[in-house]
Amino acid sequence: DSTQGWINTMDSTSNVRGATFMCASVSGVGNTLVTVGSCKVATFKGPGSFTVNSIADCAANNAMAYMVVAAGGGGGDGGTTESGSGAGAGGFREGRNNAITPYTASPLAAACSAITATVQAYAVVIGAGGGPSSSSPSGGNGTSTAGNISSFSTITSAGGGSGISGGATA
């Protein structure tokens, strides 16, 4: 058209996208962060932190499933003539989001109990196992100790109870 000029323009705001997934890292000796399928799996063998550096624009992609297992207690000693008892296992807590992580190791896991990530560092505590009892040189009964707690964010699993030495009463 000789009287009207046309300018071809595009609005780039319609094709701009934010982050699809959250970005996270782990700290601490022996702790790892790996990709399994479309999920990131953080494994802690010692204390450290799980740090969320950025979150996804879609809230569903900010769900964090978790499994927190505490340490077991130390077994009881039988001394020279009696038997000691075994100790208790450490506590187990699991939370997940069925749509993202349908697998569960627990028949009691709550269906939608995942934690929604926010940008922060989440402390991770790995409790030590309880110590065994030891008999005294004269054959008396020693005492064992309970396992220690493990925790992630606001989730805490109790340590297992200690064993009873032979001849001891509960």
Please tell me what each predicted stretch does.
Residues D1-A170:
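Glycine-biased low-complexity/repetitive sequence motifs
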